[in-house]
Amino acid sequence: FTHDNQIVGHTTRFLDDRTPKYIQDIQPGYVFGTDLQRNNWQSVIVVEGVFDALSVNGVAVLHADINDAQVRLIRSLEREIVVVPDQDVPGMRLVERAVELGWSVSMPEWPAGIKDVNDAVICMGRLATLLTIMQSRETSRIKIELRKKALVKRIRT
């Protein structure tokens, strides 16, 4: 990983069924993809994983938790922040933090089997995925909580 043309860490992904799937060595507060954001974009899509970020020109926090340094870095982009969590239980922690921060949250109702942004792009294409993300974004705490409850129910069944 790089930031301001400096190497700040790396990640390794195992292709078999090992746990954990990833081993990362990164500086605390790093957000993947901030260097790739364009000044004329009105929003930034915040996701958990690198492949998700690459799929939609977003930024990745590299897990389901956002620390204060990452919050400052994302806010420094000075645009609408749209958080798209993985559609799993850990992703719901990201939703809770986004609500605390007053950020928009998008939890599209994608077809069964799609658990993250990259899966959606593979299944539906980039444009359709971006459209569903932007159409599903929400700022109302109540609507976000209702959508989160419905998603958790779907995850558990």
Predicted regions mapped to residue ranges:
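Replication-associated primase and helicase/ATPase modules
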Residues: 1-4, 44-46, 72-85, 92-157
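Phosphate-handling DNA/RNA-contact segment within nucleic-acid enzymes
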Residues: 1-80, 94
